[in-house]
Amino acid sequence: MLSQRSQRNTSEIIPRLLREYHQPQAGNIDILDLSQAENSVLRDETLDEIRSAIGKHLNGSNLSYPTGVGGELAARKSLAMFFNDRFNPARSVSPDHIVMTPGASEALETLIFHICDPGEGVLIAAPYWSGLDLALETRSLARIVQVNIPLHEFFEMSSIQYYERALATSPIPIKAILMCNPHNPLGQCYNADVLEGLLGFCQRNKLHYISDEVYGMSVFSDSDKGVTPAFTSILSHATAPGLTSWVHMVYSLSKDFGCSGLRLGAIVTQGNTDLLLGSALITNNKVSSLTSVIVPSLLEPRTTQKLLNQNLRSRLNLNYGKVQRFLENRGLEFVPAKAGLFVFACLGKTRTEKEQLLLIECMKRSGVKLVAGTSFHFEQFCWFRIMFSLPKNIVDVALQRIGDALDETEKLL
């Protein structure tokens, strides 16, 4: 007999995941899978940097267990330098503020384990990435309390009233809010005023503020205005007395650097020693020594300038422009993206569940796979996340297949 924790996972969560993500191949067509938010536009350059780092720095000591509380010191120093250079913290980040984890999901799970007792809640605005359900609920047994915010208010000061309402009406105790900035799947950033308002909400209600900033450097120029919209890290705002012990940032190399398989995430918290030490304890030796060897080279300022400033932003902007024109030419509603690897768009006309199921079936026949907004806990039908962080020729093929699916759906309705 399995434990009660495991029984819930096998009876509820695993069947749901199989229903949502299983999609067989359509005939002889290789399906273009745009359901995973992976960054492929830097793959070649990142691979070159990793090969170079291993060739220069790998030695026999790296085959031993990792050393250091919270991860290898050299890697944590590089992360601290990167955050100080790129995230504009109000207080300088030191290696002692960082715990390394095998990915951002593990970082979130670790934070929730220390913040929430089983059955306690975390406020998250919908739509949100469904992987958070796994990170927060499967092991820590916390509960997500969904905050439904209209899209036109999602990044506005008026959004705070929805958090207040969710807190007031929650049937379970709330211990934290979790923000994704830049946002997945909406592809926008929160401005400084909204961040300050949300911090004030947390301070008034004694809630932890967790900021998932894994897309922090995947900010690209606005196609219409030719400017780079600002990403504001929560590290630049947690300045009120006593607030730093309640504010925690999560980062990972996976999205910005296009290396999800390396499994390197980080918890950054600057005023909560107990949480840091507890996190270091349960993540001890979980990050590979090989990954730790790579990090200092990958985060070296010369490398980040080339990868992020010169290559990533221009390539994401180019591909976003392709998707934007495709949607505009078809008269489809979408959330204009400024950051991230995707666009959130409504591909339906009638916006019914029947049409959404038909769209999914037609896309399968056309050889393309998207994730529906309902999988992100969005209440409206026919919204999909279109991932565009692929080689530009593949983006062209994907858009052609999506267009074919839309045409077929319209004929069948």
Swiss-Prot record:
Modified residues (N6-(pyridoxal phosphate)lysine): 255
Species of the source: Leptosphaeria maculans (Blackleg fungus)
UniProt-recorded Gene Ontology molecular function terms: pyridoxal phosphate binding; transaminase activity
Gene3D superfamilies registered for this protein in UniProt: Aspartate Aminotransferase, domain 1, Type I PLP-dependent aspartate aminotransferase-like (Major domain)
Similarity-based family: Belongs to the class-I pyridoxal-phosphate-dependent aminotransferase family.
UniProt pathway annotation: Mycotoxin biosynthesis
GO terms, biological process: amino acid metabolic process; biosynthetic process
Protein name as annotated: Probable aminotransferase sirI
Enzyme class: transferase
EC id: 2.6.1.-
Cofactor(s) essential for the protein: pyridoxal 5'-phosphate
Keywords, alphabetical: Aminotransferase, Pyridoxal phosphate, Transferase, Virulence
Domain of life: Eukaryota
Classification via InterPro entries: Aminotransferase_I/II_large (IPR004839), Ethylene_sulfur-biosynth (IPR050478), PyrdxlP-dep_Trfase (IPR015424), PyrdxlP-dep_Trfase_major (IPR015421), PyrdxlP-dep_Trfase_small (IPR015422)
Factors inducing expression: Expression is co-regulated with the other genes from the sirodesmin cluster and corresponds with sirodesmin production.
Function field: Probable aminotransferase; part of the gene cluster that mediates the biosynthesis of sirodesmin PL, an epipolythiodioxopiperazine (ETP) characterized by a disulfide bridged cyclic dipeptide and that acts as a phytotoxin which is involved in the blackleg didease of canola. SirD catalyzes the O-prenylation of L-tyrosine (L-Tyr) in the presence of dimethylallyl diphosphate (DMAPP) to yield 4-O-dimethylallyl-L-Tyr, and therefore represents probably the first pathway-specific enzyme in the biosynthesis of sirodesmin PL.
